[in-house]
From Swiss-Prot:
Protein origin, superkingdom: Eukaryota
Record-stated family: Belongs to the ATG3 family.
Protein name: Autophagy-related protein 3
Keyword Transport: yes
Length: 293
């Protein structure tokens, strides 16, 4: 738990930066984290805001918006069962300098994965060109508890990291009988490519005496910058064909200057964040469908 204590100390000592530099660095401020969280909760009702005990609350966040949580998320298979051979992964993934992989292709579909149908909003033009949709299963699959002894359930928490200025996820798992999983069992649901890079055993920072496994991309902002670069390129190509009306969907105002510059709005940040976390936890079926962009 030494790494957990060091991480907590770093979070405590890092000063809060309220300046917005999302467009240049890919990082977000606490205010932008709240904005992105509101968007996530609106598009995916399975996610909700939570309030931490008073002693654990961060004063730079609203008392009732300390973290995001989705509960009882099913996991039917361990991460290892989603991995193909090394050659297949090498063709489908591009590793960034910080150890993150830009996309993740599953070798087979999970027929029991429960992805809720979300409210429709306009897509970012050509976003699918640079985000691998094979990591998502078809929407609307009916959830069925088949009595599988491999079934696990997870409570997932998203907090704001002051040291990295990005979201940070924590996993708390339970077996099919509701008994908490041990850390080494939760590690079985994390892709081997990331198990030693981004996963850490930590005390859940929004609760007392709860052991969790945290997943925090130390340079997640670098990943966001890559996405913004591709999105901007896609928008520029789209403008060549629709120079006067670069608007998607019905009853929408023209794209804002920020959206035109980055391609991804800051309030959509957590949807993209969850897409990448899905590469780390391929068997955990939380809501992250890219239709929300």
């Amino acid at each position: 738990m030494l790494r957990s204590k060091l991480s907590s100390l770093r979070e405590y000592l890092t000063p809060i930066n309220h300046n917005s530099n999302y467009e240049t660095s890919g990082e977000i401020s606490p205010e932008e984290f709240v904005q992105a969280g509101d968007y996530l909760v609106y598009k995916f009702p399975t996610w909700q805001w939570g309030s931490a005990p008073k002693k654990l609350q961060k004063d730079f966040l609203p008392p009732d918006k300390q973290f995001l949580i989705t509960k009882h998320v099913p996991s039917y298979q361990r991460a290892q069962s989603y991995l193909g051979n090394t050659e297949d992964l090498a063709e489908d993934e591009e590793e960034l300098d910080d150890g993150w992989v830009k996309s993740h292709r599953l070798t087979h579909e999970d027929p029991k994965r429960d992805i809720a149908t979300d409210k429709k909003v306009p897509d970012i033009e050509d976003l699918d060109d640079f985000i691998d949709e094979d990591a998502e299963d078809a929407d609307g699959e009916e959830f069925q508890d088949l009595g599988n002894s491999n079934l696990r359930r997870y409570d997932l928490y998203i907090t704001y990291s002051t040291s990295y200025r990005v979201p940070k996820m924590y996993l708390v798992g339970f077996n099919d009988n509701g008994i908490p999983l041990l850390p080494h069992q939760m590690f079985e649901d994390i892709s081997g490519d990331y198990r030693d890079k981004t996963a850490t055993i930590e005390n859940l920072p929004v609760s007392f005496n709860t052991t969790s496994v945290s997943i925090h991309p130390c340079k997640h902002s670098s990943v966001m910058k890559v996405l913004m670069k591709h999105a901007k390129t896609s928008r520029e190509k789209a403008r060549e064909f629709e120079p006067e009306a670069f608007v998607t969907g019905e009853n929408l105002e023209p794209a804002t200057e920020t959206t035109q510059d980055t391609g991804i709005r800051v309030d959509q940040y957590l949807v993209v964040f969850l897409k990448f976390i899905a590469s780390v936890t391929p068997g955990i079926g939380y809501d992250y469908t890219m239709d929300a962009l």
